Each structure stands twice: as structure tokens, then as C-alpha cells.
């Protein structure tokens, strides 16, 4: 059966091109242009080099698919398998892999040069929790008004945070110079 399409302008019939399958592997009758293949049977054992017709008949007898695994090899490598199950397990493994990957986020904690001890301890607890979760922490000390005249007080706060978190974190970017009216330091969790 040939699919056709009529062109309204010229009233001619043109054959429709078949849509190329978007599968990663060629299956069964899609494997063309080769006379012999290196065959692996459904148990994973090497069956040697066989003709394509022999490989197709063996796959049909087993009620499975003949899948071209490595088309660039000489001769191409084919395997007898349940292709639907193969794709399902491959997608399932990819999902599991994606679940295991953690996106590292940068959390920000803001201090002031005159942050009280109780507030400091709460912010330090949050910093340690973020580091345990595997996130980086951006510590910012903001200056207002005349606090700019005593920048060393804010830098002392950053130095104190650095020493208090030295067991679980490393400094990724130390506070070198002010960025506008704030000093910034980024710390990351130590590798386990």
C-alpha cells in the first residue's frame, strides 16, 4: 500500500514520505542493507555471525524483537530481546539516576555588624543546616549609614562565621573588598 497525497494546484499525486521513526535502535524488518549480523540471543549468549534472515526467524520463533545494538560494527551487532521491556527498564534507570542527582542551591544568610548573640546563634544554626543538606551558603554583612566607617566590625562577623563552620565547610570566596554597602563570603560543605 502506497500512501499518496494530492497537490491541489497541479492535481498531481505525490507519494508521501514515511516519517522516520524516532527510536534509537532499528528493529526487525527495519534492519536493511546487511547480509550478516553478529547475534546475541535472548539469554545474552553469543550465537556468532548469522544471516539476517536466520536472525529474524530466530527472533520470530522466540516471539521477541531483533534489535540492532551497534550498527557501525562490522558486521552489525544485533540482540534478540523484548524491545518494549528494554526501553522501559532503560527509562526507569534514567529516572532513578535523575532522582539521585541533587541540585546544589546557594542559600543566603544576612548579618549586620551589630547582630546580637542570640540572633547570631540562630543564623549559625541555619547555616549549618544548609551545609548538611549539601547547599552552598552566601553570607552577607550589610552596612547602613555610619556603619561604613567601621567596616572591620562586619569583617569580624564573617571571620567568626568562618571559624565556627570550619569543621563542616570550606570558604569558596573570601570577603576581599566591599560590594557596594555589603561584604560577602560564600562557603560550601566539605566533601565527605
UniProtKB/Swiss-Prot annotation:
InterPro entries: T_IF-3_C_sf (IPR036788), T_IF-3_N_sf (IPR036787), Translation_initiation_fac3_CS (IPR019813), Translation_initiation_fac_3 (IPR001288), Translation_initiation_fac_3_C (IPR019815), Translation_initiation_fac_3_N (IPR019814). Monomer. IF-3 binds to the 30S ribosomal subunit and shifts the equilibrium between 70S ribosomes and their 50S and 30S subunits in favor of the free subunits, thus enhancing the availability of 30S subunits on which protein synthesis initiation begins. This is Translation initiation factor IF-3. It comes from the Bacteria. GO terms for molecular function: ribosome binding; translation initiation factor activity. PROSITE patterns: IF3 (PS00938). One of its GO terms (cellular component) is cytosol. Keywords: Cytoplasm, Initiation factor, Protein biosynthesis. It is found in: Cytoplasm. Signal peptide: none annotated. GO terms for biological process: ribosome disassembly. The keyword Nuclease does not apply.
